[in-house]
């Protein structure tokens, strides 16, 4: 079980801060990030390629694009501050880089929540080998 947890952390925690983003996802979707989004479609989880498979996967694609815009802020390792206020995620850093990364995660979590009804179990543990169509531009 411990090995499974470590693998799951490595898979979903590659961008942003695993626990912070996972907490945002849980608040907005009611789903555990590791079980539901670590390997989903072509973009949720490690890396991404091809065309997003559905609206849920497009949320992860958009997050990848957002991270690309703040790449100088080291989004894969950033630890930011945020809070939940009246059901909203509020990014609280004065540091512009940390706030930008938080906003990427915030937007993705909100998107996942707004599209939770598009979640398709057929895209859980989806093989990247199926992601061969040309990717959209960010």
UniProtKB/Swiss-Prot annotation:
Cited function: Heterodimer: postsynaptic neurotoxin. Monomer: the acidic chain inhibits the basic phospholipase A2 of the complex.
Protein name: Acidic phospholipase A2 inhibitor vaspin A chain
Origin species: Vipera aspis zinnikeri
Pfam families hit by this protein: Phospholip_A2_1 (PF00068)
Tissue: Expressed by the venom gland.
GO cellular component terms given for this protein: extracellular region
CDD domains: PLA2c (cd00125)
Keyword Transmembrane set for record: no
Cysteine disulfide links: 42-131, 44-60, 59-111, 65-138, 66-104, 73-97, 91-102
Localization in the cell: Secreted
Similarity comment: Belongs to the phospholipase A2 family. Group II subfamily. D49 sub-subfamily.
PANTHER family per the UniProt record, alphabetical: PHOSPHOLIPASE A2 FAMILY MEMBER, PHOSPHOLIPASE A2, MEMBRANE ASSOCIATED
Subunit structure: Heterodimer of a weakly toxic basic protein having phospholipase A2 activity (B chain) and a non-toxic acidic protein functioning as its inhibitor but which potentiates its lethal potency and neurotoxicity (A chain).
Source organism, top-level taxon: Eukaryota
GO biological process: arachidonate secretion; lipid catabolic process; negative regulation of T cell proliferation; phospholipid metabolic process
Region (Important for membrane-damaging activities in eukaryotes and bacteria): 121-133
Annotated keywords: Disulfide bond, Neurotoxin, Phospholipase A2 inhibitor, Postsynaptic neurotoxin, Secreted, Signal, Toxin
């Amino acid at each position: 079980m411990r090995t499974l947890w470590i693998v799951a952390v490595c898979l979903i925690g590659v961008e942003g801060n695993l626990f912070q983003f996972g907490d945002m996802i849980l608040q907005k979707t009611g789903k555990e990030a590791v079980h539901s989004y670590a390997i989903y479609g072509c973009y949720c989880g490690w890396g991404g390629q091809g065309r997003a498979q559905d609206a849920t996967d497009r949320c992860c694609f958009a997050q990848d694009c957002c991270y690309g815009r703040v790449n100088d802020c080291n989004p894969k390792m950033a630890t930011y501050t945020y809070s939940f206020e009246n059901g909203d995620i509020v990014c609280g850093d004065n540091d512009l880089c940390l706030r930008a990364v938080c906003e990427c995660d915030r937007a993705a979590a909100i998107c996942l929540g707004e599209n939770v009804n598009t979640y398709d179990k057929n895209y859980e543990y989806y093989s990247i080998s199926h992601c061969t169509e040309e990717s959209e531009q960010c």
